[in-house]
Amino acid sequence: DNGIMISGAVMFPVYNNRLMPSQADAELSANGCHVGQGGGGPHCHADGYESQGVLGVYTDADYEGKEHPPLVGFGYDGVALFGVYREDQDSQLEGFGTALDAWGGHEHDPLGYHYHADRSKSLTLSIPGAAAATYRVRSLILGAYKGKLTGTPYFVSKKSGNDATFLGGI
């Protein structure tokens, strides 16, 4: 997992435990979440924006009167995750013209660096015996962290005196 939604649900990358995009496996609810396969608790693999829907994590109503897409979660590196920029509706919102980097984030006033849910990436799946299909991925955090991991509590071992020693053993 790589973050937490403001609802308390845990965020996971686009790929599931079988290294298949969860969206392609049609195992997610309309809000981009599911109860983990193999007994895991509820978590989200995809952005849960729905324009007019009632099942989405956030909808058009969350944009009304706002200067920026709504806050939807935080990466475990402490960086905020905001909702998608809707392509044909949000040109007036702060940061709309600032491209997202490889981590799915950007920096602009007054927020500083932050992530955005994103729908700009395409994925083509080839399944034996079926035609290849290309679709847009509804990603939350892309999987890598832009934030300063050394500032995340307990992420690095302080006992060794080496701040670059990760607890994961690398």
Question: In which residue ranges do the predicted regions lie?
Answer:
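A motif-centric signal for short, conserved binding hotspots located
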Residues: 1-42, 46-170
